[in-house]
Amino acid sequence: MNDRVGPAIIVVLAGTLLGVVAFLGLGLGDDDGSPDASPTTTAPAPVTTVPGAPGTSGGAPTTGAPGSTTTTLPARQPDEVPAWTVGRPWGSVRGVTMFRGNPTRTFHGAGPIPDSPTVAWTYPDQAMCGSSSVGGETTTWCGLGWTGQPVVYEREDGITEIIFGAYDKSVHFVNAADGTDLRPPFRTGDIIKGSVTLDPDGYPLIYFGSRDNKLRIVALDRETPTEMWSLDANEVRGVWNNDWDGNPVIVDDIMYEGGENGWFFAYQLNRSYGTDGLVTIDPQRLVAMPGYDDLLIQRSGRNVSIESSVAVFDQRVYFANSGGRVVGLDVSDIRNGNAPIVFDYWAGGDIDATPVVDADGFVYVSIEYEPSLGRSTNLQRNREVGQLIKLDPYTDGDPLVWGIDLTQAGADTGIWATPALYEGYLYVPTHHGELLAVDTDTGDIVWTDNVAWHTWTSPLVIDGTLIQATCNGEIRAYSLDDPASPSPLWTTQWAESCLEATPVLWNGSIYIGSRDGYFRALR
């Protein structure tokens, strides 16, 4: 493990690096719930190196904003996500390739920031809707919801492609210029709630899960998008359900992902190209382990699903689950099937938001508060810890640096959104309807603004501007000239329905899906 970088150095690095755009990487079954199910490991196949294939490991990667000159970045070691990557894009091809842009979940896109944008196009002609069943009840879902962030893919042919999964059970591939289809949609057997990952090393592959129990890898270099591999959640004895809300993260040919069955997985992908020039994969399981144990089931009940996305920093992987457990794994020997738990913290409340890691290695976690579920032990711990917390995963003492109590007299509240970090402050909306600015050193709330109830969409910080979508169809922009006191720049309201999905901003355009069934570009 690397020693933590000093705070003073990190402040400088974070301020210098944030917002730079880089060449990015091409994101209900058996409820037995036996927490004594044994983790399984498989010895990895040898790494296949393709001459001339793009990659993120070793060397000195380059990065540059659209139209800018490139900048040489420090080299990094294989299987490591170093501090200097915080706030930067990840990989070798320009764009935004996963939920929150990189393994630390701290890159949100690239400017320029539009001024009072309006709708440039709406996709498709008819609402994207699909039926889905939970607990024997079938309902209709429309559009994009939580988390639902699109991928931005700057292709070598000059086309910018927007890729997203939707509630019509399909992944869509849309031309950013005019909102037309670039490829036929890829259909699955149920709705898609999470965010798609585009391969961060340039291979023509996407990674995503669906409520049809399957985590998939799909190739984009065929005549139509083609499934190459899938993992059925029923392959292990899990709990709760078999959805895949989390966004897969790829670090040096290894995919990390958690499922709503409560299990964490690591696969070596063995990506390559065949003699016909088409991409190939041969995924080998390195680790499969339950994210819960007997004690967690006793404390929190059987809802121990992993709905958050995995975050990676240094040679550690972090995930959280609905039982309130935050876990850190040492993946320095992951290729030999070893990923011991080196950090384990119980926060008490349901954690669906994705952990965020700053350049100093601290972990920030958003937590829900749900008295309507009636779990008294869980709620007591939830109130003690708070619903927004900062953790030190390297200390031998109490890892809780600070926690903020956001409870509201018996009401469901807390946070579903993933925070944004900027210049020593954290920005995040609450379910109750407040947008917060928090001093990351002290945990003090230094600024608030009232936004809509049920704001689950995660904020963006790009070029010193904070952007927040809301559940009343608004998008708001704030200047961060003074990061402790954001000042309003503009508000645009263009939808009557809730914006639950997280937007992405790229080259002057905001791309976002809505619960009304449609996806839009604003410029």
Question: What is each model feature region?
Answer:
Residues 1-14:
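N-terminal export and membrane-targeting signals
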Residues 5, 32-34, 38, 332, ...:
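Intrinsically disordered, low-complexity regions of eukaryotic proteins
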Residues 15-19:
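Bacterial N-terminal signal peptides
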Residues 20-35:
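Hydrophobic single-pass membrane-insertion segments
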Residues 37-72:
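Extracellular mucin-like PTS domains
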Residues 67-94, 99, 106-146, 151-245, ...:
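Extracytoplasmic/lumenal domain signature
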